[in-house]
Amino acid sequence: MAVPESKAALLEEMEKSALSLRKKLSRIPAEIAYQECLEGHVTGSRMSVANLVSYLIGWGEQVLYWHHQEAAGEEVNFPAKGFKWNELGKLAQKYYADYQHITSWPMLLVMLEENQQQLVALVNGFSDDELYHQPWYGKWTRGRMIQFNSVSPYRNASARLNVLLKALTAA
């Protein structure tokens, strides 16, 4: 799994990571989805699979918001307004809270799917040059920032779900 270096490679990795994640999430029973059965994003904390999905939606929305801010000529808040890069655990907890009112597991999965489709549409709106041949945030290209906050967390989530699914199968 090499780091994407082109628009086509990014779109391919986005699709592959989303498909893998979707397959694993489809195996999570609704009655388990809201139980704190995973290691959280903050050391020593626990989270539910629903929290994990909320985290993914939150990051996806954040990426979309960065681009909304940029298009509006506003200063882009990286990683998010009121948060620093060394406070990502707190930001994860904010994302859990942002979606805690969604108590329907199927609805949360639909929201994740819609968010992923919006990210694909975002990428499709840029040329390869705009994504990978000019810095966007410091030394990072736009494509790399999108990959950091979509493909990478999807892969991490899939790995977490593998552990849970093995435990559920063994039980």
Describe the function of each predicted region.
Residues 1-2, 39, 91-100, 136:
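A short small-residue
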Residues 1-24:
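Extreme N-terminal tail/first-helix region
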Residues 7, 11-14, 49, 105-112, ...:
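Hydrophobic packing residues in well-ordered alpha-helices of helical domains and bundles
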Residues 32-38:
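Active-site flanking loop/helix segments enriched in acidic
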Residues 84-130:
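Acidic/histidine-rich alpha-helical segments that form the ligand environment
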